[in-house]
A protein has these predicted regions:
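Short C-terminal tail/terminal secondary-structure segment
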Residues: 2-5, 151, 230, 241-264
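Conserved glycine-rich cofactor-binding loop
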Residues: 19-21
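The beta1-alpha1 cofactor-binding region of Rossmann-like NAD(H)/NADP(H)-dependent oxidoreductases
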Residues: 44, 66-77, 108, 224
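Substrate-binding pocket helix/loop in short-chain dehydrogenase/reductase
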Residues: 102-103, 110-115, 210
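Active-site helix of classical SDR
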Residues: 126, 162
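Alpha-helical segment proximal to the catalytic Tyr-Lys
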Residues: 131, 175-179, 238
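Residue(s) in the substrate-gating loop at a strand-loop-helix junction
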Residues: 146
Length: 264
């Protein structure tokens, strides 16, 4: 396949939740492929490092403050992106939160915080961007999900519910927007160390336990997602839509290295 199929030169991408963690790496990966960026966070000053990284790659970065639970805020940043660059080609719908509590301790406010950010926010950001993509007949929407859309995990029930919702949202939007030249896919990372789960990675026994259940034998590193996010944002994925792409080292196969060894 020609290398230019992965080239994002001339494209503009919005990345939400881009101040740190995987969102910052998504912005860098797209910039490395040639895209100009709109990067968003709840705190504008938190975007400084990501902006520097994008500009160091020779691309432009427009930092904007976004509260995904506020519809007016969503409309403001999408309109600002449209006015600044003239078009929006790619959305990486990444903003998300997690609250760790047992299911019987989750409060009404906890539930609303997670679902409003991870699911309602994802929908209305995608909606606002699609309104600009539809007249052009082109767009790439990449919703960031999780393996928790496939597996349930104790202690993060609202998060699992929200990620399952994102998976279904992806399929529904793909069905509706395909006629307008817009693909909608979900990139679902496995276990990557982030600000949301860093406390778990301080437990060496837990890390070893989980690694034994990952066929590739290790946790994910941010660069492991570069190829997938660029692929889904590029014309190489033009005939792929409504799909959830798991980048998880194989943990969702349901097998373990120990099981294979025992059965051999």
């Amino acid at each position: 396949m020609p290398e230019h199929r992965f080239d994002l030169s001339g494209k503009t991408a919005i990345v939400t939740g881009a101040s740190r963690g995987l969102g910052s790496y998504f912005a860098r990966a797209l910039a490395g492929a040639g895209a100009d960026l709109v990067i968003t966070s709840r705190r504008l000053q938190a975007l400084a490092e990501t902006r520097r990284a994008v500009e160091a790659l020779g691309r432009r970065a427009l930092p904007l403050e976004l509260e995904v639970c506020d519809h007016a805020s969503i409309e403001r940043i999408v309109e600002a992106a449209q006015e600044h660059y003239g078009h929006i080609d790619i959305l990486i719908n990444n903003a998300g939160v997690n609250i760790r509590k047992s299911a019987v301790e989750v409060t009404w406010d906890d539930w609303n915080t997670v679902l409003d950010t991870n699911l309602r926010g994802a929908f209305f950001v995608a909606q606002a961007v699609a309104k600009r993509m539809i007249p052009r007949g082109y767009g790439r929407v990449v919703n960031i999900g999780s393996v928790t859309s496939v597996f349930g995990y104790a202690g993060i029930t609202p998060y699992c519910a929200s990620r399952g919702g994102v998976k279904q949202l992806t399929m529904s939007l793909a069905d509706e927007w395909g006629a307008h030249g817009i693909t909608v896919n979900c990139l679902a990372p496995g276990w990557f160390e982030t600000d949301q789960n860093r406390v778990l990675y301080q437990n060496e026994a837990w890390v070893a336990y989980l690694e034994d259940r990952i066929p590739l034998g290790r946790h994910g590193q941010p660069h492991d997602l570069d190829g997938a996010v660029v692929f889904l944002a590029s014309d190489s994925s033009a005939y792929i839509t409504g799909q959830t792409i798991l980048v998880d080292g194989g943990i969702t196969t349901g097998a373990t290295k120990a099981t294979v060894q025992d059965d051999a």
